[in-house]
């Protein structure tokens, strides 16, 4: 994942170079990197991450105006604190990390001036297909993985409604897709409207619950998964 690779490069300072810069400047930089990573995990939004690498992990991201403004304000805070760091007091990989992190935050700042978030679907893919296809590429090794996944399933209707609101906002503003990019989009939704919950790609993880999970718990997880897909996911996709 691009974001994780970038973070790895940013945090590999002492392993790659013998940094001799100002300790306080270095400490503040690493404090910013840690805080930003923690917030990204909390928000479940990773700037410039390949959407094909999307993996739900508990509560899904908020995509409404309040959340967007919150993330924008946090990014501005990061830029302000970066500006207070004397880059001349950094050396080696620390200076590279500073420059790269600042570039990413400046790019994120500019991204808020565009309206691409109002177009979360096309004829080929969208937030709903990334969500539906993610489980096939996720590792479910224990009970906690399934419990977090159930939280994601339960939260999908809210996540879906917020994206529908974005689409409506685009209509209200007079913004529309180029016809070719949206032609046939309904099929990507129809693919999720299965007759039986067990046919859903979202149920597949419950068919491969590892033996490390007790039999009674496996049955309970399967029942919960079926209920959420039937009563929450499928109705949400019909909206």
Task: List PLM regions with ranges.
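N-terminal secretory signal peptides that target proteins for export/translocation
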Residues: 1-4
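Bacterial N-terminal signal peptides
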Residues: 7-17
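Phosphodiester-processing cores and adjacent nucleic acid-binding clamps
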Residues: 20
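N-terminal maturation segment of proteins
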Residues: 23-239
């Amino acid at each position: 994942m691009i974001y994780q690779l970038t973070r790895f490069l940013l945090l590999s300072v002492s392993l790659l170079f013998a940094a001799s810069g100002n300790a306080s400047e270095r400490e503040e930089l690493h404090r910013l990197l840690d805080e930003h990573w923690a917030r990204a995990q909390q928000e479940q939004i990773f700037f410039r991450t390949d959407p094909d690498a999307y993996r739900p992990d508990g509560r899904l991201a908020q995509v409404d105006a309040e959340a967007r403004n919150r993330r924008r304000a946090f990014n501005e805070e990061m830029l302000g604190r970066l500006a207070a760091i004397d880059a001349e007091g950094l050396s080696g990989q620390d200076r590279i990390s500073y420059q790269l992190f600042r570039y990413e935050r400046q790019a994120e700042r500019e991204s808020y001036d565009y309206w691409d978030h109002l177009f979360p679907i096309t004829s080929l893919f969208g937030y709903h297909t990334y969500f539906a296809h993610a489980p096939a590429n996720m590792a479910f090794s224990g009970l906690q993985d399934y419990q977090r996944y159930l939280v994601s399933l339960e939260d999908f209707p809210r996540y879906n409604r917020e994206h529908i609101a974005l689409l409506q906002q685009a209509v209200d503003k007079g913004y529309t897709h180029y016809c070719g990019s949206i032609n046939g989009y309904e099929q990507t939704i129809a693919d999720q409207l299965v007759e039986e919950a067990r046919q859903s790609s979202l149920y597949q993880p419950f068919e491969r619950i590892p033996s490390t999970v007790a039999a009674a718990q496996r049955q309970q997880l399967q029942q919960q998964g079926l209920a959420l897909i039937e009563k929450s996911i499928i109705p949400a996709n019909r909206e």
